[in-house]
Amino acid sequence: MKYLHSMVRISSVDDSLDFFCNKLGVIELRRHDDDKGRYTNIFLAAPGNEDAMVELTHNWDPEEYAGGRNFGHLAYGTENIYTLCQHLMDNGVTINRPPRDGRMAFIRSPDNISIELLQQGDALAPAEPWLSMPNTGSW
């Protein structure tokens, strides 16, 4: 058995690609538009980790995703959680659970998907402003 990908439904291709690619730093691997099925699939991955993909599915006809069709969270490892969180904040992303422990943070995508950010290797030493930053919303 081989892991293939996780699928997340999105409401806006532009907002989602801005968030995932421009702010979070993942890359678009491929895209497929299905005119008959009226949807677009976009496959993303962290640079250097192209085998672990996230599939963004955009259904062209508006649809509310509720009743168990939502998702727990995605998780990405990073070389420096403080640098990534600062970059995200500088680009307007709310850090819902700051990396107070130097190891873990949570953010949300434009479609409210929870994303866990994990420090690769050992946790960084606790540091400000993260150490005293409160949680914002839910994660």
List PLM regions with ranges:
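Vicinal oxygen chelate
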Residues: K2-S11, L29-H32, I42-A46, P62-W139, ...
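Intrinsically disordered, low-complexity acidic/polar segments
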Residues: M53, Y65, L124-P126
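Core segments of cupin and vicinal oxygen chelate
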Residues: M7-D51
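Short, mixed charged/polar active-site loops
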Residues: D51-M53, S114
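Flexible, glycine-rich phosphate/dinucleotide-binding loops
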Residues: D35-G37, P62-E63, G121-L124
